[in-house]
Amino acid sequence: WTLPYGPLMSIPPVASYLILHNTFNLLPADSAYHIPIILWGVIGIAILYVFLKEAINARTALFASLFLGLSPRYFGDLHNNMKDIPSAAAFALNMWLLWRLVNHKRLIDLIVAAIAFAVAFNIKVNSVFIPVIAAAWFLYIFLMHRKSFRPTRFVPYFFLAPIFAFLLWWVFWPDPFGQLRHAFLTFGIGTNNIEVILNGAWYCSGSTVPWYYPYWYLVITTPLVILGFFLIGLMSLIRHIRPVSILLLLWFFLPLTRYFIPTIGVIDGIRHFEEVLLPLSAIAAIGLDRLLSFARPGLAKLILLFVYSLLLITIGVYHPYQIAYFNELVGGAKGAVGKYDLDYWGT
């Protein structure tokens, strides 16, 4: 038995199916199987909230968690996608723990951050970008705070994280080295030659898909209100640079750089880079918070009521096919017909 990704995301759905359906017959088979996926998605929202509450403020944290939870594509995948939702949640956990490592500088934070990477790696190989983000962020902090920065507090992370990841990997696979090679090879070629349609043009995954595919798809599948606040937040982060600002920017942009390599496969819209929806929501929340800081209390409440009511209505209109959501830039799902894939898992 072999899989081109870590086994951790497969265990909870199967266990839930065996317990809640086979053993006690409490739920239909599909519902029992999907409950852990929903929990993963909710945990991802909760992690984003806690992280931003500690790093920025509670209001921004609340805005971000609502943006994420009411993003149609995330909401849809949360009910069906057993790989990419757990991967996104684990990615968020790692970003929060890296932030805690830098801010608290304790041995326990170092160990927990390394263990979190092990868990993320054993969910999906997308997690290889976590230490890349960590390295870039630590380098920034070193350059900006050379006098107070102590490399000995952070360098061990880059040794412990891969060691812990491989030890956990070893537990699950009889041929851990061969399986590791299989995972990395599949990361690049697992979707080769699958047809991909983008704006009415046909491409082949792993060879001809353009580098801008992820950015294009994020623009057309993110609700316009979130997209607008994201742009405001992006400008705010660039104007007011702080360590947490750099971390959010790295979290959003670095994982997408892999698509500059034409041989990296991508299909099914945003699901292969779902981890960037969390920093996108965070940056949008910063933009909303920034806008509200200029508004009177009454106007601020009206803005919030309009924004979140619109998102909630969108979720309701598309239910249960939120995976097929496209925004007004392409004319919604109707305008996307013949130009984009409208369905994959669960639709």
Segments from the language model and where they lie:
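Loop-to-helix entry region of an early transmembrane alpha helix in multi-pass inner-membrane enzymes
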Residues: 3, 7-11, 22-46, 65, ...
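Short helix- or helix-capping micro-motifs
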Residues: 64-69, 76, 92, 96, ...
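Transmembrane-helix motifs of polytopic, lipid-linked glycan transferases
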Residues: 35-55, 93-97
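Transmembrane-lumen/periplasm boundary regions of multi-pass, lipid-linked membrane glycan transferases
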Residues: 5, 11-12, 119, 135-262, ...
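Membrane-interface alpha helices of multi-pass inner-membrane proteins
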Residues: 64-65, 109-124, 217, 256
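Short acidic/glycine- and proline-prone juxtamembrane loop motifs at membrane-interface regions
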Residues: 73, 79-86
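Membrane-interface transmembrane helices that cradle and orient dolichyl/undecaprenyl
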Residues: 94-110, 240
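Hydrophobic/aromatic-rich transmembrane helices and adjacent perimembrane loops
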Residues: 84-87, 120, 129, 217-224, ...
